[in-house]
Structure formats: structure tokens, C-alpha cells
């Protein structure tokens, strides 16, 4: 459906503009240390993870997938890990604490174990 595809494209573009604004706000607040190309790349990479995470779970863990709260939380962890590489020294302890709270082992071929 061409109309649905166009509406989704507009939605995706709005989301990425808003996400870029959030990341730019983190830069201005001194939470993340990034230049504009890095903000753009992080925005795009975060969008890719957020929109592909459920599909990843289904293809990695089989047709039933693992859509538990833990595995959805792990998707948030993946994005936070990308962001953490740009964290300022002042923000790093809070980000690391949040990473520890969100981390869930995958128990999949990605981490070398079998399900």
C-alpha cells in the first residue's frame, strides 16, 4: 500500500528528527560528548536497533521469538551501550549503573551458548 508506506516514511523521519533533538540536548547538557556527524550517526544507529530488535529476537531464537520483558529491556541496553561510548566523565557512572540494571544475557549464538 503506497499510502501506508508514505505515512510510515513520514513517521520515521519525524521520529529521527525528534531523536536527534534529544541527543543534541544531551550534548548541550554535557551528558554526551559528540559533534554533529556523530549525533546523526547515533540517531540512525539507535533507530535501526529500536525498529529491528523484535525481528532480531524472532530470527535468532526461532519463530516463537523471546518477547519477554527481559529481552525487550535488552534492546534498550543495546541502544544505551551505543550512547555510552560518548558519555562525559560526569555522566558515565549513572550510565554504567543503568547498563547494569538493563543487561540481560542473550543465551544465544551471539554470546556463544546454545538455547
Language-model segment annotations:
Residues 4, 35-39, 64-68, 72:
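Residue-level recognition of alpha-helical structural elements
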Residues 55-115:
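C-terminal peripheral helix-coil segments that are non-catalytic and often amphipathic
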Residues 3-29, 40-55, 73-81:
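Amphipathic alpha-helical packing segments from all-alpha helical-bundle domains
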